[in-house]
């Protein structure tokens, strides 16, 4: 059997594959990791069963339940997922169908999402990556006045629904963005509250403000959903439904992948193999960076999303046993083939202090023009991916390739 075949994880029914042949996990390495593998499988089962995962805050971590509420450990938690989900879908449908309208316009045409970190990165990624026919999406994700006014001045204010997202309701950047937006609406003669939606914890500062000021809608964010993993919660689903995304399909895709990555078989579990590859590449301490190279314009924000998800999750001074480890994985990236004209030169010839994650999207929806005999732009894109991966491999640089059918 070829090295490629040995190191391939493929889910044909999902159209997804992961190629570890440029960062191979041999039997000797897997054997040396068996104790950690067994613990990870056991800890994952405990986590999804409701074990306390955050010892500092004494709370569960339940973002996995969002994709399949049947996994929630209590009926109350299941209801806390199903109820808001139904409410989100109904709200989005009513906005897009024109049943919920702004006071001074026939229908909403735009949505302004105000948030930061996980409250913005996930929704921004979905808005940028998934084509849909709903509202035009805009974001305030910083406290830079110039950036905020640039966005605000481009909005059709009377047709804009504002979604303010903050778990605690007291995040300074989000609060600042909300106050600036409120002031901008007022100065332009448009009422803010009737066009405003809050996504926040029950009883938070934002929740109380929205209630007192008579905002259009409030959606509850649970304390067992962390910001960086909240894209499948109301945090991500409210903007997604307004954008016109079929959130049932979004959740179903995540659920199907969850099922594939709960198998105790290491060689057929993509999540476990990714974790092992990261461990091997970084010597278990984050000694190398991860460079994310999606060869698709629609995924240009994916590296930013992964940057928070991975670095905030793994960047720790102490491990769960209380040992000082000061470890993590630094993540950066942009998109291919743009990166080939930016920093791939250093990746190939400079310090070998990274491993790469290539993301291949096999199909293009608009690719009919031949730019050379028998070759389209999409063919060139695929060729650049394969050529860059091979050039890095020839220079002793490790990589993983994730292949998906489309976005």
Language model features: what each stretch is:
Residues 32-47, 134, 192, 215, ...:
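Structural alpha-beta junctions
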Residues 17-31, 72-82, 241, 286-289, ...:
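Generic amphipathic alpha-helical segments used as scaffolds and interaction surfaces in large
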Residues 29, 33-36, 40, 80, ...:
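General structural feature for long, well-ordered alpha-helical segments within catalytic domains
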Residues 1-104:
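Extended, charge-enriched "interface" segments that sit outside catalytic cores
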Residues 69-80, 108-111, 137, 159-170, ...:
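Glycine- and acidic
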Residues 90-93, 97, 105-264:
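Glycine-rich phosphate-binding loops that contact phosphosugars or nucleotide phosphates
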Residues 332-406:
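Helicase-primase coupling helices
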Residues 184-357, 362-366:
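Active-site phosphate/pyrophosphate-binding segments
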């Amino acid at each position: 059997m070829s090295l490629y075949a040995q190191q391939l994880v493929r889910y044909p029914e999902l159209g997804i594959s992961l190629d570890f042949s440029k960062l191979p996990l041999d039997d000797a390495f897997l054997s040396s990791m068996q104790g950690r593998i067994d613990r990870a499988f056991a800890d994952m089962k405990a986590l999804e069963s409701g074990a306390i995962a955050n010892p500092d805050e004494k709370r569960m971590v339940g973002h996995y339940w969002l994709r399949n509420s049947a996994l929630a450990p209590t009926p109350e938690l299941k209801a806390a997922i199903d109820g808001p989900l139904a409410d989100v879908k109904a709200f989005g449908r009513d906005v897009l169908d024109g049943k919920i309208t702004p006071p001074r316009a026939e229908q909403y045409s735009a949505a302004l999402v105000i948030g930061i970190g996980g409250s913005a990165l996930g929704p921004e990624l979905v808005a940028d990556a998934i084509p849909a026919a709903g509202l035009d999406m805009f974001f305030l994700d910083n406290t830079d006045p110039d950036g905020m006014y640039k966005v605000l001045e481009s909005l059709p204010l009377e047709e804009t629904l504002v979604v303010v997202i903050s778990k605690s309701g007291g995040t300074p950047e989000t609060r600042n963005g909300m106050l600036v937006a409120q002031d901008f609406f007022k100065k332009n003669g448009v009422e803010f509250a009737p066009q405003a939606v809050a996504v926040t914890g029950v009883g938070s500062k934002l929740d109380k403000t929205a209630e007192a000021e008579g905002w259009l809608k409030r959606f509850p964010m649970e304390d067992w959903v962390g910001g960086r993993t909240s894209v499948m919660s109301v945090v991500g689903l409210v903007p997604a439904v307004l954008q016109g995304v079929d959130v049932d399909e979004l959740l179903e895709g995540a659920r199907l992948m969850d099922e594939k990555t709960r198998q105790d078989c290491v060689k057929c579990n993509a999540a476990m193999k990714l974790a092992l590859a990261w461990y091997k590449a970084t010597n278990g301490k984050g000694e190398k960076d991860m460079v994310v190279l999606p060869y698709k314009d629609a995924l240009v924000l994916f590296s930013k999303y992964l940057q928070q998800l991975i670095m905030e999750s793994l960047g720790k001074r102490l491990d769960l046993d209380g040992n000082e480890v000061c470890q993590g994985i630094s993540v950066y990236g942009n998109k291919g083939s743009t990166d080939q004209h930016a920093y791939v030169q250093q990746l190939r010839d400079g310090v070998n202090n990274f491993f790469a994650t290539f993301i291949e999207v096999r199909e293009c929806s608009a690719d009919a023009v031949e730019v050379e005999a028998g070759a389209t732009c999409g063919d060139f894109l695929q060729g650049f991916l394969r050529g860059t991966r091979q050039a890095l491999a020839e220079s002793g640089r490790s990589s993983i390739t994730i292949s998906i059918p489309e976005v």
